[in-house]
């Protein structure tokens, strides 16, 4: 084996302390908190691996480490140079640096991962998901090196990882299929021809793809050409394999998948379905298990077809068979993911089976501990993918930055947080911007959903833009609450894009009352401080006077906010209870009215409400209410009089410039100074978090300047191209 430059860091006495005192048969969640759900328990007399290496990063690496630690297995983490202080590195017993920040120079370097296995003496490798998890050559090389691949055998990965070949196998296994072209698409012209033959719309996707990358929907020839080119580039970047296929796009389906678990003794189980229809850019946003759309008989048929396919390829690990389901409950095979799925926690919640634990057991050679008849379906679970993304831009353009404040809502009943970050962690342009998989479990769908609302309201994230506003709005939205969802849910519910939560008049009063009460309390405290050397009666007087403000709350972007005359009077001199008069209405507010607290639990007219203060400056408080930040102006009456003399800033015409919508790297520049371009023409292609983004001209005109070159790294808001 070729030697690769690597550095090994051993962490003494970490990881085994928990397992040393663990009792056989005790569920993992008693020792590891609420991160892991299993009722199967652990047999500590059963042979197992001594040490495994996790060929991944972030939350999935942490997730695998938790189960391995509970089983008494030592762990080795790998990392890039920018990940040296990451949480998964700190959690592991040993860590090996495998290269530079770009994935192609580190996490996708199979040779360096193999060298790390040899250097550390790891007996097996868990690949997580993404990266090398579905790389047949890597799995085969591991086998040659005498190490186990904690996943399916390399032949099964090859058969199912190639989307073209997998469709042929699925057809032979009598799995319901989507119409399409079985061969590889050679170029843009062929893509257009095949698309016409199938009939638009079509789905253009990478043969080796997954996770929503390398996929585009095309409704015409132009989109087919652009979709082929962008998806091919994306596939090469993400998977090192740019082969493409085309199939009929089923408009407005549900995306429902079946978890399978198989061993090396011919046993195969289906662990119930997951509903994954809420998506943007073909990536899942919120998942649930089970699906409210799937009756028991349909569940059985989907499960049996999934197992048929798994057995047809000799599958021997955890995997997921994905289906598209139409409105008549007809289901069609989409693909099989030969790895641990991102959303596996919700299946663990409803079955009590730790899928990672069983992957470790099966890879070692043990049979599955239960039969199909013993697979339970207990309650309901949801997973919200919390991303460092701006939900107001295309339902989520990636964001970067450092987490200046970070508190997970683990105190909420039924909550599980699978994350790979902590306060102070950096979200960079090199990797997926996932912050956490927020999971809730309840006795039924309504309880699990209510717990998700509470968890999102209590989730504290500062320093990066995140998608909690969108997640929180979805979980309270009527269609979602009733289970009326398809893959078109987001564009149908938010046709103009996500604009934030819309507040009713009553909810507007809540936000104004809260902000005004906070401001009044701040002034009362200031008066106490200024008068601290005077008689005590002046201290009480600070909370006995009436504070008058003019408050305003913009309900929609661009609209001039309505101003309200507000009076705040603290009840019985209490700092935590006040009556707020807004025009002719009176609101009673009590509870945590402290500006310094990240989360405020209050009661408004007897109703419990959770809010957060995410920004404050003179005359303005930004209140996070139902996930959406609202900037509330709270000004003394005199100050408002002077505002009329302040000129409003003129709006800038941005149609003459192309701005970077996010931090990223420039992949293509398609114009030069002097070129004539038409409105909507593609000018620049940039990549961020392994996703390709095409940037277009906002108007017809001549190119005045091109400020970037291919390979350049740019920040959000940089001017890339200028038009005359």
Swiss-Prot record:
Q: Where does Mn(2+) 2 bind?
A: 335, 337
Matching entries from CDD domains are given as: biotinyl_domain
Q: Which Gene3D superfamilies match?
A: 2.40.50.100, 3.30.700.30, 3.40.50.20, ATP-grasp fold, A domain (3.30.1490.20), ATP-grasp fold, B domain (3.30.470.20)
The entry marks the following residues as binding Mn(2+) 1, namely 322, 335
One short Pfam name that applies is PCC_BT
Location of the protein in the cell = Mitochondrion matrix
Which pathway does the UniProt entry assign to this protein?
Metabolic intermediate metabolism; propanoyl-CoA degradation; succinyl-CoA from propanoyl-CoA: step 1/3
Q: What does this protein do?
A: This is one of the 2 subunits of the biotin-dependent propionyl-CoA carboxylase (PCC), a mitochondrial enzyme involved in the catabolism of odd chain fatty acids, branched-chain amino acids isoleucine, threonine, methionine, and valine and other metabolites. Propionyl-CoA carboxylase catalyzes the carboxylation of propionyl-CoA/propanoyl-CoA to D-methylmalonyl-CoA/(S)-methylmalonyl-CoA.
Record's protein name: Propionyl-CoA carboxylase alpha chain, mitochondrial
């Amino acid at each position: 084996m070729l030697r690769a430059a690597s550095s090994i860091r051993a962490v003494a006495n970490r990881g085994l302390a928990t397992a040393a005192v663990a009792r056989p048969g005790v569920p993992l969640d008693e020792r590891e908190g609420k991160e892991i759900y299993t009722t199967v328990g652990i047999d500590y007399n059963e042979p197992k691996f001594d040490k495994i290496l996790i060929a991944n990063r972030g939350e999935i690496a942490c997730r695998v480490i938790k189960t391995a630690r509970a089983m008494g297995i030592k762990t080795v983490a790998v990392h890039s140079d920018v990940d040296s202080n990451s949480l998964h590195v700190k959690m592991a017993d040993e860590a090996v640096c495998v290269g530079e920040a770009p994935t192609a120079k580190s996490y996708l370097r199979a040779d360096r991962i193999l060298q790390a296995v040899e250097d550390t003496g790891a007996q097996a490798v868990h690949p997580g998901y993404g990266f090398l998890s579905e790389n047949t050559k890597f799995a085969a090389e591991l086998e040659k090196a005498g190490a186990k691949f904690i996943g399916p055998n390399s032949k099964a990965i090859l058969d199912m990882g190639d989307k073209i070949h997998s469709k042929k196998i699925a057809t032979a296994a009598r799995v319901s299929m989507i119409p399409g072209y079985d061969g590889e698409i050679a170029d843009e012209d062929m893509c257009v021809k095949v698309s016409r033959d199938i009939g638009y719309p079509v789905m253009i996707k990478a043969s080796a793809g997954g996770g929503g990358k390398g996929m585009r929907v095309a409704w015409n020839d132009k989109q087919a050409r652009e979709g082929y080119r962008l998806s091919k580039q994306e596939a090469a970047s993400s998977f090192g394999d740019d082969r493409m296929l085309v199939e009929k796009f089923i408009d407005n389906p549900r995306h429902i998948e079946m978890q399978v678990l198989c061993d090396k003794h011919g046993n195969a189980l289906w662990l119930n379905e997951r509903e994954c229809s809420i998506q943007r850019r073909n990536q899942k946003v919120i998942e649930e298990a089970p699906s409210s759309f799937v009756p028991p008989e349909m569940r059985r048929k989907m499960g049996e077809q999934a197992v048929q396919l798994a057995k047809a390829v000799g599958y021997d690990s955890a995997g997921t068979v994905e289906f598209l389901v139409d409105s008549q409950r007809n289901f069609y095979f989409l693909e099989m993911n030969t790895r641990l799925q991102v959303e596996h926690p919700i299946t663990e919640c409803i079955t009590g089976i730790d899928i990672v634990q069983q992957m470790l057991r099966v890879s070692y050679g043990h049979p599955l501990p239960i039969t199909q008849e013993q697979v339970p379906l207990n309650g309901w679970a949801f997973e919200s993918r919390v991303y460092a993304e701006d939900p107001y831009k295309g339902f989520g353009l990636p964001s970067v930055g450092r987490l200046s404040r970070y508190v997970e809502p683990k105190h909420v009943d039924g909550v599980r947080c699978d994350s790979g970050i902590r306060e102070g962690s950096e979200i960079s342009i090199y990797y997926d911007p996932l912050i956490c998989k927020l999971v809730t479990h309840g006795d039924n769908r309504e309880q699990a959903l209510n717990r998700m609302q509470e968890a999102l309201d209590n989730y504290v994230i500062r320093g990066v833009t995140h998608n909690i506003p969108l997640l929180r709005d979805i979980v309270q939205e009527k269609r979602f609450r009733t289970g009326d969802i398809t893959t078109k849910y987001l564009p149908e519910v938010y046709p103009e894009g996500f604009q934030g939560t819309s507040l009713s008049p009553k909810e507007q009063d809540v936000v104004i009352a809260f902000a005004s009460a906070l401001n009044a309390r701040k002034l009362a405290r200031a008066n106490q401080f200024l008068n601290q050397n005077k008689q005590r009666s002046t201290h009480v007087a600070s909370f006995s006077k009436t504070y008058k403000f003019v408050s305003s709350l913009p309900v929609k972007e661009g609209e001039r906010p309505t101003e309200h005359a507000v009076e705040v009077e603290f009840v019985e001199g209490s700092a935590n209870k006040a009556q707020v008069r807004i025009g002719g209405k009176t609101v009673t507010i009590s509870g945590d009215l402290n500006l310094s607290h990240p989360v405020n639990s209050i009661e408004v007219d007897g109703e419990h409400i959770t809010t957060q203060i995410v920004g404050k400056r003179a005359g303005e408080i930004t209140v996070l209410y139902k996930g959406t930040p609202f900037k509330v102006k709270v000004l003394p009456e005199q100050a408002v009089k002077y505002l009329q003399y302040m000129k409003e800033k003129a709006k800038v015409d941005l149609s003459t410039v192309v701005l970077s919508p996010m931090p990223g790297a420039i992949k293509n520049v398609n114009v030069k100074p002097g070129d004539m371009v038409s409105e909507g023409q593609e000018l620049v292609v940039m990549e961020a978090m392994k996703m390709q983004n095409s940037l277009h001209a906002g108007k017809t005109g001549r190119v005045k300047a091109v400020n970037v070159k291919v390979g350049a790294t740019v920040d959000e808001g940089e001017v890339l191209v200028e038009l005359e």
